[in-house]
């Protein structure tokens, strides 16, 4: 069979398997995930051997040290994958939950019940752990999942999927509910994105270029997250100690993640007092500052910011800083340059905090807290499949519930429409 024919078969089989997955009781899904976790641990030497093939190929290709690090599996990372499966097993099962129930004047009882989405396609880059993480979340939510990882991790991904699939067979669960596209060629991705007859949703996880490629070529709905241009606004009433703590944490703790701070906005009334303080602290922490003229007046070490800086996702120790006239300009700036990801205000003014929450058009908005909390675990969702900056079907960090949809359920007693 051609690649196109094989991928169509994988997708069709996943659709059939999704029917069985939707019927699985919670205990069966949890038992499966626990067995999968044990299987990963017991197959650690095999996984490391398969991963070594990817690492050796990556070194020959000249992959960067950072890419090779993301690609690498060792005992600790395999244990972390297994722990992740156990964590998902411990999460509440959203499938079958009745989220609302109301009574109509004709005594009909109407409700909404959570059901699986069906078949979910995950397209991701060279992170073998995503194979286990994404599979666990999709399966727990009663879905089939089709995985297409980066070609750099092909041996690792296939090995992980094979081990997990063996546990599904032992449990009497259709193995087709978990598939990996085995073709490293880009044609495999393109054919996967054509299977709108069988796949309900595509979730790409990776850099902006990957996500734009998927969106451009997909016939299937896509959950998008292009980049994280996250802001903190220090209001005129802000507590400076709190503001400094939040800014440092948001920028410095992990600068290479999507919920790290990229642009700092400061109210003009506190610019003279706060900018020298925060600039000195950040400079000591090796952060390069890029500011407007007002910022550079109080922090001469800052480079002159350009228009591109206001829309940049640096993912490194660089911070754009701007002085604004007040809350209105801060909100306008965020809504103009932000990426609908995560924004925070530091303020003691309740009215300003509520306006910021209502008017900032992003998926996570915080008051007096670091942008680093925009994460499924930190927000109490448990493990997350990703962060969506698409308002349909989900907005913000996506947990198990976001891998389901709802249907109407109606209880009657013989009513007919008049």
UniProtKB/Swiss-Prot annotation:
Similarity annotation: Belongs to the gamma-glutamyl phosphate reductase family.
GO biological process, one term: L-proline biosynthetic process
GO MF term (any one): glutamate-5-semialdehyde dehydrogenase activity
Positions of transmembrane segments: none
Subcellular location: Cytoplasm
Gene name linked to the record: proA
Reactions this protein catalyses: L-glutamate 5-semialdehyde + phosphate + NADP(+) = L-glutamyl 5-phosphate + NADPH + H(+)
PANTHER family: DELTA-1-PYRROLINE-5-CARBOXYLATE SYNTHASE, GLUTAMATE SEMIALDEHYDE DEHYDROGENASE
Keyword annotations of the record: Amino-acid biosynthesis, Cytoplasm, NADP, Oxidoreductase, Proline biosynthesis
Pfam families: Aldedh
Record carries keyword Oxidoreductase: yes
Record HAMAP family: ProA
Xref: InterPro entries: Ald_DH/histidinol_DH, Ald_DH_C, Ald_DH_N, Aldehyde_DH_dom, G-glutamylP_reductase_CS, Glu-5-SA_DH, GPR_dom
GO cellular component term of the entry, any: cytoplasm
Protein name, entry field: Gamma-glutamyl phosphate reductase
EC nos: 1.2.1.41
Function: Catalyzes the NADPH-dependent reduction of L-glutamate 5-phosphate into L-glutamate 5-semialdehyde and phosphate. The product spontaneously undergoes cyclization to form 1-pyrroline-5-carboxylate.
